[in-house]
């Protein structure tokens, strides 16, 4: 497989136009995701500094639960919407968004009940209302954000995301300086900023009255489109969330806090991983219509190459100066400064995660969700097999096990993609395509 070049036989002015479009879309999605990740990183650093290890570990577990529920919303709402918008006339977008919003509200209600019940069952009834409020407000912010990004409006999403995520970092800083920061107050403060960001997003969207008669058929269609995405993202989350929960069981929530502290450094690559990953499904879906899986991959790899240099530069920095990165993030007297080796392992793992995740996103965009699920399932198998490393090595074992799982997923994803491209470009496939009536 070769990287580079625009889709099809584009040349000259068409190639230049395609390149400008790619750069514009990729740039704004990276800027938007950069704002989100910067705010999230500052928030996590502040909470790691000022909360007890036990409370910060609890916060990390809560975040994991939110991501699991967010995957349901993304797969059954945001991903199908991004596919549908490509084929819907612009004059009908408001009607589509109105009906989609109604489905999203109903789904959020169900998930919020599960969030409340889960918090109580885990023995933290004291923060059940706070976690549920935070989850619902996050749902509102993230769903409206996805409404914008589904139409490639990443530039329009920046202000709402800045309000939410940079606002959270600011308000947590104020609470910490006033000695009023607790896990509960942090969750309520985060909720308030998510609602403010959602309001900004809504101001940039147009909604028509929902067509309630069409909502059930629409949800069925969304479910058909999103079921493989749901399975895919849940196994991805299972692969990553398996380790903090296992650490909490075998070593306590303080070990989970150390894991999260190391992961926060690697997560600085998330603006690229999540940003490029946001735009690839839509780009691959559009290119597949005329170019098949080959066209989808050609479209996707341009975005992958766009994000690869900063991934490699950051990975090299962390490998060369892990202690400096930890000290810069958590201060010179932080209990997390002994996590250097863990940070190095996770940095390498996240670089591999970038490529593997983008291949999986390409498969989803090309409506090959079954193969995307199979690809990610291999990572879960690798995680389960490597999980016992936690017992002798603790947090270090968790980092090694996750790196092994990510590497297995990457290898399998590359093999799947190579097989698909070879199959589509084989002489037999080309002859069959030539015989199809036009």
Can you say where each PLM-predicted feature lies in the sequence?
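Transmembrane helical elements of multi-pass membrane transporters/channels
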Residues: 24-41, 157, 163-164, 168, ...
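Small-residue-rich transmembrane alpha-helices that serve as helix-helix interface/gating elements
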Residues: 184-198, 377, 381-382, 396-414
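Interhelical loop/hinge segments that connect adjacent transmembrane helices in multipass membrane
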Residues: 5-22, 129, 155-160, 181-189, ...
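Helix-loop junctions and terminal segments of transmembrane helices
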Residues: 40, 73-90, 262, 266-292, ...
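Interfacial segments at transmembrane-helix termini and the short loops linking adjacent helices
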Residues: 118-131, 320-351, 396
């Amino acid at each position: 497989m070769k990287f580079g070049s625009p889709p099809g036989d584009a040349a000259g002015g068409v190639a230049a136009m395609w390149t400008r479009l790619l750069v514009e879309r990729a740039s704004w999605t990276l800027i938007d995701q950069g704002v989100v990740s910067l705010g999230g990183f500052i928030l996590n650093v502040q909470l790691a500094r000022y909360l007890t290890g036990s409370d910060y570990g609890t916060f990390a577990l809560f975040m994991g639960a939110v991501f699991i529920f967010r995957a349901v919303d993304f797969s059954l709402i945001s991903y199908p919407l991004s596919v549908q918008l490509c084929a819907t006339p612009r004059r009908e977008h408001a009607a589509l968004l109105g009906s989609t919003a109604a489905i999203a509200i109903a789904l959020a209600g169900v998930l919020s009940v599960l969030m409340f019940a889960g918090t109580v069952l885990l023995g933290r009834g004291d923060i059940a209302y706070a976690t549920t409020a935070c989850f619902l407000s996050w749902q509102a912010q993230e769903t409206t954000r996805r409404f914008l990004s589904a139409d490639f409006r990443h530039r329009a999403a920046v202000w709402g995301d800045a309000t939410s995520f940079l606002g959270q970092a600011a308000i947590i800083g104020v609470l910490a300086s006033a000695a009023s920061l607790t896990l509960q107050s942090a969750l309520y403060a985060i909720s308030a900023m998510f609602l403010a960001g959602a309001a900004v997003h809504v101001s940039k969207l147009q909604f028509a009255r929902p067509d309630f008669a069409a909502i059930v058929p629409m949800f069925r269609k969304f479910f058909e489109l999103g079921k493989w995405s749901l399975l895919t993202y849940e196994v991805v989350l299972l692969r990553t969330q398996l380790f903090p929960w296992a650490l909490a069981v075998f070593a306590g929530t303080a070990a989970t806090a150390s894991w999260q502290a190391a992961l926060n450094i690697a997560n600085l690559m998330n603006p690229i991983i999540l940003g490029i990953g946001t735009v690839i499904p839509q780009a691959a879906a559009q290119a597949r219509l005329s170019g098949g899986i080959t066209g989808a991959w050609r479209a996707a790899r341009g975005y992958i190459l766009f994000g690869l240099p900063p991934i490699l530069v950051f990975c090299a920095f962390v490998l060369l100066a892990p202690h400096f990165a930890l000290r810069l993030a958590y201060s010179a007297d932080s209990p997390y400064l002994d996590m250097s080796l863990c940070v190095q392992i996770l940095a390498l793992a996240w670089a591999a995660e970038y490529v593997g995740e983008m291949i999986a996103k390409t498969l989803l965009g090309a409506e090959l969700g079954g193969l995307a699920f199979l690809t990610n399932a291999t990572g879960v198998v690798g995680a389960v097999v490597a999980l016992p490393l936690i017992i002798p090595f603790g947090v270090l074992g968790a980092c090694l096990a996750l790196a092994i799982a990510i590497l297995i997923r990457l290898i399998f994803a590359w093999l799947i993609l190579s097989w698909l491209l070879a199959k589509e470009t084989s002489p037999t496939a080309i002859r069959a395509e030539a015989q199809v009536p036009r």
